[in-house]
């Protein structure tokens, strides 16, 4: 789509843009970019999750765990050049995870392991922040709350290292990869653009 097409759409369906100031700003941005294609550039920040989990040893090397997980996803996109439309999306998720792990090497202080499992996530809050910039000057900004109803399922695998605080409590870090199944929502996150991607997980294991 070209900016001229978008301008025609704005003029034909102004009711699709209830924020009058945002609508006027988009008209100016479309005018300044006339003749150019509407190319959107998006940067996705690395997702980081924090987890509290309960782990049960089922043999000398194997264990199973269940955890409560918090994840923050954010991205920034822009359309246009000197006059542009900038959008920042921030989403907060709470999830439940189940994992199976195998200890690869253990000392009194550290444990090294491989783990895999699945997670179900639910978005609990989100915001979309928008800046409307005309000739390098921001003329308007807006913020709206996002509501994402569907649950999202994923499977993941990682290598982990745990610092053993005491025999029952350990702090861990897990760099790994995850695959996210589509949830039917219309949000734009790294999970939708790249269903298979690397992530980083931090947390605490309670072992019993």
State the predicted function of each range.
Residues 1-5, 70-74, 104, 118-124, ...:
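Transmembrane beta-strands of outer-membrane beta-barrel pores
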Residues 10-16, 21-43, 73-93, 123-152, ...:
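Extracellular/periplasm-exposed beta-strand and loop segments of Gram-negative cell-envelope proteins
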Residues 50-56, 66-70, 96-102, 116-120, ...:
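Residues on the lipid-exposed face of transmembrane beta-strands in outer-membrane beta-barrel proteins
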Residues 61-64, 108-110, 167-171:
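Repeated loop/turn-to-beta-strand initiation elements of outer-membrane beta-barrel proteins
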Residues 45-49, 91-97, 111-113, 152-156, ...:
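Transmembrane beta-barrel architecture of outer-membrane proteins
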Residues 1-18, 111:
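Outer-membrane beta-barrel biogenesis signature
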Residues 148-154, 162-208:
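Predominantly the C-terminal beta-signal and adjacent terminal strand-loop region
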Residues 1-9, 47-59, 75, 99, ...:
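Transmembrane beta-barrel domains of bacterial outer-membrane proteins
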């Amino acid at each position: 789509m070209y900016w001229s097409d978008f301008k025609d759409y704005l003029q034909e369906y102004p009711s699709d843009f209830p924020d009058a100031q945002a609508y006027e700003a988009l008209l100016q941005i479309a005018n300044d970019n006339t003749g150019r294609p509407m190319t959107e550039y998006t940067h996705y920040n690395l997702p980081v999750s924090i987890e509290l989990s309960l782990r049960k040893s089922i043999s000398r090397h194997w264990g199973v765990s269940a955890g409560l997980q918090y994840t923050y996803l954010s991205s920034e996109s822009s359309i246009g050049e000197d006059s542009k439309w900038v959008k920042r999306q921030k989403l907060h998720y709470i999830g439940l995870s189940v994992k199976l792990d195998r200890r690869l090497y253990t000392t009194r202080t550290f444990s090294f392991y491989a783990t895999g499992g699945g997670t179900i996530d639910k978005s609990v809050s989100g915001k979309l922040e928008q800046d409307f910039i005309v000739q390098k000057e921001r003329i308007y900004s807006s913020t709206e709350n996002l509501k994402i109803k569907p649950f999202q399922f994923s499977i993941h695998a990682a290598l982990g290292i745990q610092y053993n605080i005491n025999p029952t409590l350990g702090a861990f870090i897990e760099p790994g990869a995850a695959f996210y199944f589509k949830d039917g929502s219309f949000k734009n996150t790294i999970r939708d653009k790249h269903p298979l991607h690397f992530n980083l997980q931090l947390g605490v294991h309670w072992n019993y």
